[in-house]
Amino acid sequence: MTQANLSETLFKPRFKHPETSTLVRRFSHGAQPPVQSALDGKTIPHWYRMINRLMWIWRGIDPREILDVQARIVMSDAERTDDDLYDTVIGYRGGNWIYEWATQAMVWQQKACAEEDPQLSGRHWLHAATLYNIAAYPHLKGDDLAEQAQALSNRAYEEAAQRLPGTMRQMEFTVPGGAPITGFLHMPKGDGPFPTVLMCGGLDAMQTDYYSLYERYFAPRGIAMLTIDMPSVGFSSKWKLTQDSSLLHQHVLKALPNVPWVDHTRVAAFGFRFGANVAVRLAYLESPRLKVVACLGPVVHTLLSDFKCQQQVPEMYLDVLASRLGMHDASDEALRVELNRYSLKVQGLLGRRCPTPMLSGYWKNDPFSPEEDSRLITSSSADGKLLEIPFNPVYRNFDKGLQEITDWIEKRLC
């Protein structure tokens, strides 16, 4: 089946698909304080989703392309779930968030198919994969159209990997008690086995969102990157996120001695946002298998346990948390009680001495991850490093912060 035919088949209207903002039904969508964060973007009036320009541009999307798609959504006069929110158009049609971003992805998919130069074709496939992922964002459970966009993103990513430098292998890992999970091992040029970074991504991202991290920071240093999806999304969708948040990553770590391309004696974990919750758990529970752990904007305690902090977080992000926990209809109080159990301090881990070297990068006044969370991580480590990343200029400082983190990982890993 051709890629174009697959798109037509997946998105063929069958019934009235639920609109994304209606999938979690607990929170009152009232006025909220404006939020701006380097890793999560910012709240913009009249949008349900946070607009994450920095990360989308970092992944290779042109800022003008973002504005063009937003404009198409804004200009639509189709029926919306909430007339005050542009990105709540009902049904797969013009103006719907998933429709517009997927349509943009198909443009690049067609360019990729028409391009004869393999590397340029690979770039176009990667661009399409990123746009399909934005279409599926924020990846709420039960969002049928988003899941179809994710399937197209994975297909495009596999096409890109066949054409881009280095080697990528799709790997299946067995997890006792449930379905196996699929990960991607990205390997630089040269002979393995390679020192490897196990990526622990945020809850609102897919494993295929981190190719830029591999290409710009790890591959030039001869470091491989292994990704898996977080529980409840993508290739890990059959697994619910639980208080044992590192379960899937632990089973992957235990399998690495049997992966010939990975030097299992030189493995690091790198956690973005809630992925840092996973990475720090690994530092405590799997210290013999991990050389180092690095975190960026970690969600390990305050957001999970402080009601005032939760009140400052946008509706969309709380919906993501509720969706991952399988609490689509729970009360606010029930969600607060459950989130508290995910705090690594409440679990009795953070605060105890940890032998694994840990670095944590943070931004001042980050609504999702205060400085205290990063200090708690680094002060718990026998070899901790605290890294403050200035906010402005946001893109340059983000890049500089990632370079410093990669330097730190390389020094201890290689």
Curated annotation (Swiss-Prot):
Which regions span the lipid bilayer? Answer: none
Q: Name one Pfam family in it.
A: FrsA-like
Q: List the molecular function annotations (GO) for this entry.
A: carboxylesterase activity
Q: Which reaction does it catalyse?
A: a carboxylic ester + H2O = an alcohol + a carboxylate + H(+)
Superkingdom of the organism of origin: Bacteria
Q: What is its EC number?
A: 3.1.1.1
InterPro entries xref list: AB_hydrolase_fold, FrsA, FrsA-like, FrsA_esterase
The UniProt keyword set, sorted, is: Hydrolase, Serine esterase
Which protein family is named in the record? Belongs to the FrsA family.
Cross-referenced NCBIfam families, in alphabetical order?
A: PRK05077.1
Please give the function described in this protein's UniProt entry. Catalyzes the hydrolysis of esters.
Entry protein name: Esterase FrsA
